Swiss-Prot record:
Belongs to the PHP family. Keywords: Hydrolase, Metal-binding, Zinc. GO terms for molecular function: phosphatase activity; zinc ion binding. This is Probable phosphatase Teth39_0577. Zn(2+) 2 binds at H16, H41, H196. Zn(2+) 3 binds at E74, H102, H133.
């Protein structure tokens, strides 16, 4: 399966990443990607950018180094109600929004009901597009309930390559179970490198192994065609009243 876009990348503005957007785009071009999503951490992540940073992403060009750039964020899910660390006024200006649980913002717990509720409530937010690294073992979830919500609200579940390489140790089994259930239920998948340095942009090898082993086909994967993400965003804009019916 060939992927032509990366839905999850970070720049130095995330506080603990090491490359600029230009460096990320240059690496993406070298690897044959057509598009990357710029998804720096939301402001409640220590060292992350102020909310004004996200409000001003509009100044970036649509293409850098020959690669299309979608301006976005990886927001932090803050509580069981699915509240996020950026206000609606900022979220509505962004192209793409990943919502994730991080231990500095949401206390890790074995409470499956609590974790599941937080993610499902984030899914219900009309500005959220992707649930980031849901296989993290420090946040056990009811996989079927989360996937049912994702399908109902037309959102994507992420298979995150860094979960198998450098972060969230022990994610492999959960990610496979998520991928397998997504295949069974017809839930759509986004594959993200979660690159925190330019060299990792477009690294999908481990995530692709999981997808293959779970039997997921191209029709369920957002990253196989730039047209898919553009069509999704057009429909999202229509649903939230951003353009005329």
């Amino acid at each position: 399966m060939k992927l032509v876009l990366d839905t999850h990348t970070h720049t130095i503005s995330s506080g603990h990443a090491y490359s600029t957007i230009t460096e990320n785009a240059r690496e993406a071009y070298k690897k044959g990607l057509q598009l990357i999503c710029m998804t720096d951490h939301g402001p409640k992540m220590p060292g992350a950018a102020h909310l004004w940073y996200f409000g001003n992403l509009k100044v970036l060009p649509e293409k850098i180094e020959g690669v299309e750039i979608l301006k976005g964020v990886e927001v932090n899910i803050m509580d069981e109600e699915g509240n996020l660390d950026l206000p609606e006024g900022i979220l509505k200006k962004l192209d793409i929004v990943i919502a994730s649980l991080h231990d500095v913002c949401f206390e890790p717990s074995d409470d499956i009901e609590r974790n599941t509720k937080a993610i499902i409530n984030a899914i219900k937010n009309p500005y959220v597009d992707i649930i980031g690294h849901p296989g993290n073992p420090i946040y056990p979830i009811d996989i079927e309930k989360v996937l049912m919500a994702a399908k109902e609200y037309g959102k994507f579940i992420e298979i995150n390559n860094s979960s198998f390489v450098s972060s969230r140790k022990g994610s492999e089994e959960n990610c496979f179970l998520i991928a397998k259930k997504a295949k069974e239920m017809g839930v759509k998948i986004a594959v993200g490198s979660d690159a925190h340095v330019s060299f990792d942009v477009g690294r999908f090898e481990e995530a692709l192994k999981v997808i293959k082993n779970a039997g997921i086909t191209e029709d369920l994967v957002l990253n196989t065609d730039v047209g898919k993400i553009k069509e999704y965003l057009k429909e999202k804009k229509r649903k939230i009243g951003g353009e005329e019916e």
